[in-house]
From Swiss-Prot:
Keywords annotated in UniProt: Amino-acid biosynthesis, Branched-chain amino acid biosynthesis, Chloroplast, FAD, Flavoprotein, Magnesium, Metal-binding, Plastid, Thiamine pyrophosphate, Transferase
Binding-site residues for thiamine diphosphate, renumbered to this chain: E60
Keyword Cytoplasm assigned: no
Swiss-Prot/TrEMBL cofactor(s): Mg(2+); thiamine diphosphate
Gene3D superfamilies reported in the protein's UniProt record: 3.40.50.970, TPP-binding domain (3.40.50.1220)
UniProt entry tagged with the keyword Flavoprotein: yes
Protein name: Acetolactate synthase large subunit
Location in the cell: Plastid, Chloroplast
One cellular-component annotation, GO: acetolactate synthase complex
Length: 585
């Protein structure tokens, strides 16, 4: 539709795209369809003016995952689009993935016209109702005049407090309807009418108690989760840890929140965490939880998790406080704010500090590190997944890493050393198929950075169609497939807990030739089968311009250890036998 310059008569679709641009959205991910065509038609004009760019994925689930990773990589809100019916339902897994990991995304769905809602019209589903349990908030646009307010509220709600997913459902005729559009000259001057007002900041009394508990502790540990990453609190965490020499362990979501080359770093804790991190948590006298939620994959047997410790729990979401573990001190706040105030208070009273208060504790942890290091098996005739991932980590130290879910994800968490905001992985929901579209989102967010996708042969086949998106936009992404021809984690559990009854977990028969598959999309593919010259091969791969798929044929029966069996405590780990070749921090 043509508009006169300065005209106020606009369509709902115009208002929607205008508000996205006013909220500084530069890139969106989606897939068109009937009910959302008015929005796509409007988007066409805005793209011509280079005010916004849309990336066409090959499946709507990938649009949500790409928006999710874009949000993680930029600390902004990611946006995805899909049509009504199957387009909208295809977003559901991606929306749930983002919500479980507290990632701010806005999913915009088309809907049948208002007159047809409730009539079982073609491609009508109640996406508002379907997604209610897996979003932070939902909107249905019933009047185009509400679009400005709804979009502003969606951005506010998605980003403020504990971040999360927001759905905006837009009937087709709302996008087409013309009305007298009143935009906002400055979004900053527009205060959303929502009553959602999260409270930030600790009290002076809370900071003083935090300091007192910390200074009285002899065996403290920082237990850092995804909330610290979202808060971008790495500097403050490192300063606090260095100030009193406190060891630090992170969750899967918390990777990158602390310098992983720092000797105070213990790696990940929990089911596949390092032995020394789990031992340290089991023996600590003060557990400081920063943006972590005490989930089952971390705690093991909850009654025995840090059972001798006092707990300080800092989280922006009051619902997480006391949900699984009652703390002695609870602070509902952004982590960065709390740590800044704590550090300021501690620096004022340095004369009362015992500089050696944790020396014996650190010495004990150092012994655990030497006794139970992460192991890397080696055989010149074979290729082990730990070798591949460890070499990638050493060569690509500044890269963004997107992973899928399974054994390779746990090995990546163990061996990759990542920087703040550069770890992209589905942690809460554990969504297979996340890695490839996440790598796309990260590349769009950071076009000049190295993006590496580490996936498994089973996970990769969940969303391999996104090779088409990578080819279309010529995205320089390096895809390492850890190919053991199994659903590796399922096989490991079947071996350990189901008497080796491998029910439907073998993927060998019917597996495509991934190299030829990549070539069919116009993407170069290569295969690596042994550890011979592995370092030089990976160096060449990473330095080669353009997208590249690497099919790593690894030992088929390798298991991921350490491992905590269901119902066991974190001090009861499987697989702590010494290996021929080891690596320590």
């Amino acid at each position: 539709m043509n508009y006169k310059k300065n005209s106020l008569i606009k369509t709902g679709a115009f208002a929607l795209i205008d508000m996205l641009v006013k909220h500084k959205v530069k890139n969106i991910f989606g897939y068109p369809g009937g009910a959302i065509l008015p929005i796509y038609d409007e988007l066409y004009h805005w793209e011509k003016k280079k005010l916004i760019k849309h990336y066409l994925v090959r499946h709507e689930q990938s649009a949500a995952h790409a928006a999710d990773a874009y949000a993680r990589a930029t600390n902004e809100v990611g946006v995805c689009l899909a049509t009504s019916g199957p387009g909208a339902t295809n977003l559901v897994t991606g929306i749930a993935t983002a919500q479980m990991d507290s990632v701010p995304i806005i999913a915009i769905t088309g809907q049948v016209s208002r007159a047809f809602i409730g009539t079982d019209a073609f491609q009508e589903v109640d996406i508002f109702g379907i997604t209610l349990p897996i979003v932070k908030h939902s909107f249905v646009v019933r009047d185009p005049r509400d679009i400005s307010t709804i979009v502003s509220e969606a951005f506010y709600i998605s980003k403020h407090g504990r971040p999360g997913a927001v759905l905006i459902d837009v009937p087709k005729d709302v996008g087409l309807e013309e009305f007298n559009y009143h935009d906002y000259d400055s979004i900053r001057d527009h205060k959303p009418i929502t009553k959602y007002r999260p409270i930030y900041g600790p009290s002076i009394r809370q900071i003083e108690k935090f300091k007192k508990m910390l200074l009285e502790s002899k065996q403290p540990i920082l237990y850092v989760g995804g909330g610290a990453v979202m808060s971008r609190a790495q500097h403050e965490i490192e300063e606090l840890a260095s100030f009193i020499k406190i060891p630090v362990t992170t969750t899967l979501m918390g990777k990158g929140s602390f310098n992983e080359y720092n000797p105070l770093y213990l790696g990940m804790l929990g089911m596949h965490g390092t032995a020394y991190a789990n031992f340290a948590v089991s023996e600590c006298d003060l557990l400081i939880a920063l943006g972590a939620r005490f989930d089952d994959r971390v705690t093991g047997k909850l009654d025995e998790f840090a059972c001798n410790a006092q707990v300080i729990h800092v989280d922006i979401d009051p619902a997480e406080i006391g949900k699984n573990r009652i703390p002695q001190l609870a602070i509902i706040s952004d982590i960065k704010i709390v740590l800044k105030e704590l550090l300021s208070s501690m620096k004022e009273g340095t004369n009362n500090m015992d500089k050696n208060q944790t020396q014996a504790w650190l010495h004990r942890i150092h012994k655990w590190k030497k006794e139970y290091p992460l192991s890397i098996p080696h055989d010149s005739k074979l290729l082990y997944p730990q070798e591949v991932i460890n070499e990638i980590s050493q060569i690509a130290q500044k890269a963004f890493f997107a992973t899928d879910v399974g054994q390779h994800q746990m090995w990546a968490a163990q061996f990759l050393k990542v920087e703040q905001g550069k770890w992209l992985s589905s942690s809460g929901l554990g969504t297979m198929g996340y890695g490839l579209p996440a790598a796309i989102g990260a590349k769009i967010a950071n076009p000049n950075d190295l993006i590496i996708c580490i996936t498994g042969d089973a996970s990769f086949q969940m969303n391999l169609q996104e090779l088409g998106t990578i080819a279309q936009y010529e995205l320089d992404i390096k895809i390492f497939i850890i190919n053991n021809q199994w659903q590796g984690m399922v096989r490991q559990w079947q071996q350990a807990f189901y008497d080796q009854r491998y029910a439907h977990s073998n993927m060998a028969k019917g597996q495509p030739d991934f190299v030829q598959l990549a070539n069919s999309y116009g993407i170069r593919g290569i295969r690596v089968t042994t550890s011979k010259d592995l370092k030089s091969k990976i160096e060449r791969i990473i330095s080669t311009p353009g997208p590249l798929l690497i099919d790593c044929i690894v030992a088929t029966s390798e298991n991921c250890y350490p491992m905590i069996a269901p119902g066991k405590s974190n001090s009861q780990m499987l697989g702590l036998t010494k290996q021929l070749k080891t690596i320590t921090n």
